[in-house]
Amino acid sequence: MKRDIHPEYVETQVSCTCGASFTTRSTIESGTIRAEVCSECHPFYTGKQKILDTGGRVARFEARFGKASAGSKK
């Protein structure tokens, strides 16, 4: 690697809108990152995720074409 071309790697405080915060390392000069979601509040990590079926599209598709098993052909 060439000398004196890489940015400084400093400790960075990451804070989320949910109130959680943790320390990591980054090249951001300010030393702070504000995030909207993190592993503490994201639905995937908290287990509170919901599958939204907007307007019953899946049910309408299954009613129209039937619920075929994987690998079956007509």
Swiss-Prot record:
Its cofactor is Zn(2+). Binds 1 zinc ion per subunit. Coiled coil: none annotated. GO terms for molecular function: metal ion binding; rRNA binding; structural constituent of ribosome. GO terms for biological process: translation. Induction: Induced in response to the thiol oxidant diamide, suggesting it is part of a disulfide stress response system. Oxidation of L31 may cause ribosome stalling, which would decrease the protein synthesis rate, allowing the bacteria to concentrate on stress survival. NCBIfam families: L31, PRK00019.1, PRK00528.1. Part of the 50S ribosomal subunit. This is Large ribosomal subunit protein bL31.
